[in-house]
Amino acid sequence: MMKRSNEGIGGENYASSPSDDGQQKRRKIQFEPVRMPAVSNVNDIRARAVVYQTSKLKQQLLYKNKRIAELEKENERSKRRQQTDESNFLKVYNMFSDIEKYICTQTKNEFGEYIGGDTAPTGIDVLGMTNETYNKFFDQAKQNLRNAFVSYAKARHDRAHESTIFIDKLKTLIDSPTFNPNGVHKELTAKAASLAIQNEKLQSEVTKVQSDCYNLERKKRILTDKLSVQENRVQELEHQLEDARFETDKHMRLANKFEYKLATLVSEGQSGGNGGATPSSSGTTNATEKKISAPDIPPSETAAKEIENLRLERDEQESIASRRLQDLEEMNKKVQTLTQENSKLRLETQTFFSVDSIVNSEEYKNLKKYYSLAIKEYERVSKDLEDITTERDAFRSAKEARAMLMSEEHQKTLKEIQCQSDIHNSFYKVSHDSEVLRCEFETVKEEYNKTVKQSEWDEMKATLNTLRSMNRSLKSEKIRLREKDKQSQKDINTLKSELTSLKEAQDKCLLVPLEDVSNAPPEDVNKIRQEYESLCKEVKRLGAMEKQEKQKQVENLQKEVNRQIADKLSELETLRKTNEMLTNDEECISDELEAIGTAVEEEQERNAQLYIEKREQEDRNLKMMNDRMIQNQTFNRLREKLSCLESKAQTDAQIAKMHEFEKKANEELVTKLSESVQFKSAELTRLTNLMEQHRKNIQEVGMSRDENQIKADRCEGQMKQIQELYAAKAREIEDFKFKRQRAEEELETLRIKYERVKRNESVPAQSGDQVLEEANRQMKETLTCPSCKTRPKDCIMLKCYHLFCETCIKTMYDTRQRKCPKCNSNFGANDFHRIFI
């Protein structure tokens, strides 16, 4: 909320009141003076207030019409922006469809045919679609792209599966007795050639993808820097735009007000020119009333000067607004040029010693190829050697493990035969014990059924359920009566609080005297005093009538409250009596329930003992049955194991014969593999020498690259320092230009105001009628609210003793602008009070 100067209503200053009105200082916030006509009663005041409210509403309507036109322009701009967004979306959608087509063609070229899903629409078809159909086709396009990726991955997986099948096939061929090494070597060479071609393709793709990824990351960094700069700029422009909107809104409201005033003054001038001047009476009071109330008098020189001043102010505000818009456009252009230059400098520094130039050089590519080939050959030879050694060790370990297993299984069979004989003996003993226990269980069960009957238990349960339901109903009724008692006490407390609040409101009513009007001739002062005394008498009479009515209302309220309190007290006594009766009944019922509960608990204890004995007997029988089941299962398992051991003995004899044959084949393979290992070791030494040479070359290239990187970092640091200095200087220059421009504008406005003050001083002194009219106007302005200018003063601030209307203060309090418009002091709910002037 803006701070207001300590000024009176209509422009009078309480601190210092200079004699000349023309030499007054310009106020920070100036209430617009309203010329009110003569008033005979309160209804006339309200009628005039309605007239001024309609004028304010017309001004608001003009403002809203202009805002609607501006919003329509913004709507057109947003439509254009939406069209550009749709075109960008079309580009992205087509790019995704191109990716899908590329993946499909790759899968067809490498792995065969590709079975795709439903085709998604093109980007041109998507533009005219509704929201539902667009969502369906968008999901279809996503599914097609996902299917393309899945098919490509599946094809890769199938190829890897084929290679594993081929390796398994080789192993089976080597294990078979009819082993032909020439055929295996041919298949291996063919497979190695196909795998080498695939590896070359994959390596080229990997290098290409790595270079693309590096370029994309570099572009991403550049774009992120640009984005951060643009975001900062957008935030600054948003703040500037908000300030500009606030200024334009304020100027629009002023322009609407001035246009409405101009239109009203022109209409009054035309009506005055058409109708003749009315004759003035001899009395000064009648003349002033006619001047104020007559609408067909032509406008005076002061009104014409005010219109000219308003027009000049409007032109000044328009010129200032146009200048500031031009400044904003120039600043936007400067910022765009600076961002472009910054991005160019950044790109130049990054591309001067770029990694792409090193990576794309022929020497680097040749070194990379030789290095990759040497590493592949080294890995292949080392893998072959490891496979041969692992196979040899596996054969030896398998042979030893089989011999150990055969000896262990022979010992296990002997142990199992002994266990079977022991289990047979224990089984016969357990069966005899189970029959004895079953007979005992049947006898106990018959005795228990004779002692206890089911009908007695049912009767006991029914009586317990009825007693529980009665207890619940009594408790619910007790809770309901307590709630009723609490509600009656709350009503009594609320009525007492209302009584106290009404008494306090009656005591807080105040009357505030008004100050006398100074600096006026004695005849006018006497007349004004007579009018003032008559007005005060009427106000006192009205206040006394309202006080009597209020006292009558308060007495009636007290009677009603006392009557309600008596009714509530009688209800409370009846409720207390009923509560006592219910508590006595509840105690009797609880005693009966306790006696019944003890009897029920004794019966339950007896039943629990009988149940425990029954469960123990059942547990014994179950244990006997479980033991019998376990014995049957062990017999079946032993029979199965005997059959398995017989079959294993036959298979072990056959396996021993196979091992002798495999031993001979493995010895031949070991001799061949030892020869191949010697040849591969010679090749490996040669390749290691080549690798060391290439490694030295790569280290030299890396050192040169690091030096270039250090130089580039140093250049970037220098460039950033220069940019920061440039930005700081540019900001200082812009601030200085802005301050200078604002100072020039303020000087120009002060010059215009000084000329206007000189012109007003040259005007001759006003006539006696105008002086009296001005005094009458000031008197009426003292009685009107300075905030809304329409309603009379009927409320006072208890902190600062400033007067306003009650509606304005309530609106300020409700909108949380809880500060006095004159002295800017805070106020609360109890800091303002209604008065009668």
Swiss-Prot record:
Record flagged with keyword Transferase: yes
Main localisation: nucleus
Function of the protein: E3 ubiquitin-protein ligase that mediates monoubiquitination of 'Lys-117' of histone H2B. H2B 'Lys-117' ubiquitination gives a specific tag for epigenetic transcriptional activation and is also prerequisite for histone H3 'Lys-4' and 'Lys-79' methylation. Involved in regulating stem cell proliferative fate.
Record's compositionally biased regions (Polar residues): 277-287
Quaternary structure, from the entry: Interacts with ubc-1. Interacts with mrg-1.
Tissue localization of expression: In adult animals, expressed in oocytes, germ cells, pharyngeal and intestinal cells.
Keywords: Chromatin regulator, Coiled coil, Metal-binding, Nucleus, Transferase, Ubl conjugation pathway, Zinc, Zinc-finger
Taxonomic lineage from the root: Eukaryota, Metazoa, Ecdysozoa, Nematoda, Chromadorea
Database matches in InterPro entries: E3_ubiquit_lig_Bre1, Znf_C3HC4_RING-type, Znf_RING, Znf_RING/FYVE/PHD, Znf_RING_CS
Keyword Nuclease belongs to the record: no
UniProt source species: Caenorhabditis elegans
Disruption phenotype annotation: Worms arrest their development at L1 stage, and show tail abnormalities. RNAi-mediated knockdown on a glp-1 mutant background causes significant overproliferation of germline cells.
Gene Ontology CC, one term: nucleus
Enzyme class: transferase
EC code(s) of this entry: 2.3.2.27
Coiled-coil segments: 54-89, 185-253, 300-397, 458-651, 677-763
Molecular function terms from GO: ubiquitin conjugating enzyme binding; ubiquitin protein ligase activity; zinc ion binding
Zinc finger (RING-type): 785-824
Annotated metabolic or biological route of this protein: Protein modification; protein ubiquitination
Classification via SUPFAM superfamilies: RING/U-box
Protein name: E3 ubiquitin-protein ligase bre-1
